[in-house]
Amino acid sequence: MARLPRLALAGHAHAVLQCGQGERPVFADDVDRAAYLHALREAMAAEHTAVHAWALLPDEVRLVATPADAGGLARLVQSVGRRYVSAYNRRHACRGALWAGRFRSAVLEPGPTVLDALLWADGASALPGHSSAAHRSGGPAWPGLTNPAEFWALGNTPFEREAIWRDRMQLGLVRQREQWLRRAVMGGWVAGDPAFSVDASAAASRPSRPRPRGRPRAR
């Protein structure tokens, strides 16, 4: 069966996951993480894609981003990947691919799902420089990061929003919700309710949810 084209919608937030091959860590230290973030800032501007959250883990990268056009997300990830892998290989005197195949992504339904995706990234690591958590929690702002409308709606003042986000960070993302989001990302589907999935399918001209297993029912 032919592989479906990537599901991506202009103007919608997406959760993105890019995994390392496992043979070596994706980030060895703070210098590597700084190099990745530098490449990310350059690609954001070049590809007109807003980044809302990031997490740089030893074996994977998590992003939440909104592309201005359907192809912007892929261009962003590919641009960052090329720049970073080149710098990584030079610095560590190694060669070859760093990533395990294609990146994975899911279109996010506006509303609570976008906030869950932010928490999926911000909550992945509390270490400075490992995620964008500080940007929303009263710490140093990361240049170029934009908060989505869902975050702005949490409170009327920056202090109120930051306090609410710190509380959410402390509670963490419900495990079942995190598993649901990751399944959508790994499958390349929509993370949303059935009605939003129907709209996404129509907009992208491809399925947005996995088909039921087994043969179609006879009519």
Q: Model regions: which residues?
A:
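Short Pro-Cys-Gly-centered "Cys-loop" motif that presents a nucleophilic cysteine in a tight turn
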Residues: M1-L57, T66-R219
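Conserved G/P- and acidic residue-centered "switch" motifs that form tight phosphate/ATP-binding loops
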Residues: R62
